[in-house]
From Swiss-Prot:
Protein family per UniProt: Belongs to the class-II aminoacyl-tRNA synthetase family. Editing domain AlaX-M subfamily.
Entry note: cofactor: Binds 1 zinc ion per subunit.
UniProt-listed SMART domains: tRNA_SAD
Lineage: Archaea, Methanobacteriati, Methanobacteriota, Stenosarchaea group, Methanomicrobia
GO annotation terms (biological process): alanyl-tRNA aminoacylation
Main location: cytoplasm
Function noted in UniProt: Functions in trans to edit the amino acid moiety from mischarged Ser-tRNA(Ala). Recognition depends, at least in part, on the acceptor stem of tRNA(Ala).
Annotated PROSITE patterns: AA_TRNA_LIGASE_II_ALA
Cofactor requirements of the protein: Zn(2+)
Binding site for Zn(2+): 107, 111, 210, 214
Family annotation (PANTHER family): ALANYL-TRNA EDITING PROTEIN, ALANYL-TRNA EDITING PROTEIN AARSD1
Record's protein name: Alanyl-tRNA editing protein AlaX-M
NCBIfam families: a_tRNA_ed_AlaXM
Length: 251
């Protein structure tokens, strides 16, 4: 099983690792990685692997988790035409930091605005999808008062400006269940097969189980703007938002 370095240090930009498995010349499993694999509505990290012995670089275009292993999809050969990676090769992993940091800001922002919608409207969060420029939150809500979302945006931005610390904890599922009334805001909850849980606490705001990458404090979000609201039928609603410094003003 790959050691997930991003679990407790989301700011790790580079790391050293050893190649443990190579499939079809382009799917690489390392003993440890800081690359976040696509999951939980958060896209994967990208970046590159640099082989220690000759400096050959391999672009990482996707990372995914399969049976406990995190697989990195790379260009089959080095950008300089070098031979492909082999089991036992020592590599340095380098994360595309701009992409990672954008997703970190989006993910922590999602926790803030989702918590506000839950508390203020009594909504139940049913899904989410992060993007570099815009993210969405899906929720179940019978009475859909669009006018109130301007107030929810204001409350979320007040929380962001208060610069709450964000803490990460890795605990057993039993301990998590003892500490929390629920493991996640998502209605579907967590699989019973999960025995170890990573908790994300925004001090004074919310604490829940989440495996994504997050900021150290809410101030780094800077602010959000709700861009669009959609009625998806019955009680299904969808909200799109962007980071304030990237807001497009879509309606």
């Amino acid at each position: 099983m790959t050691e997930a370095l991003y679990f407790l240090d989301c700011y790790l930009k580079e790391f050293e690792a050893t190649v443990e498995k190579v499939t079809e010349g382009k799917y690489i499993v390392l003993d440890r990685t800081a690359f976040y694999p696509e999951s939980g509505g958060q896209p994967s990290d990208t970046g590159k692997l640099v082989r220690e012995r000759d400096g050959a670089e391999f672009k990482v275009v996707y990372a995914g988790k399969f049976n406990g292993d995190i697989s990195h999809e790379i260009s089959p050969e080095g950008e300089t035409g070098a031979e492909g990676l082999k089991v036992g090769d020592k590599v340095k992993g380098i994360i595309d930091w701009d992409r990672r940091y954008r997703h970190m800001r989006m993910h922590t922002a999602t926790h803030v605005i989702a918590n506000v919608i839950e508390k203020e409207a009594g909504a139940q969060i049913t899904g989410n999808q992060l993007g570099l420029d815009q993210s969405r939150v899906d929720f179940s809500l019978e009475a859909f008062d669009r006018e109130k979302f301007a107030e929810y945006e204001k409350i979320a931005n007040e929380i962001i400006a208060e610069n709450h610390s964000v803490n990460l904890y890795l605990v057993s599922r039993k301990e998590a269940e003892e500490r929390l009334s629920r493991l996640t805001t998502l209605a579907k909850g967590f699989s019973e097969e999960i025995t170890e849980v990573r908790l994300v606490e925004i001090e004074g705001v919310t604490i829940e189980a989440c495996g994504g990458s997050h900021l150290k404090n809410t101030g780094e979000i800077k602010g959000i703007k709700i861009e669009k609201l959609q009625n998806k039928g019955k009680s299904n609603r969808r909200m799109y938002f962007s980071l304030l410094d990237q807001a497009s003003g879509l309606k």
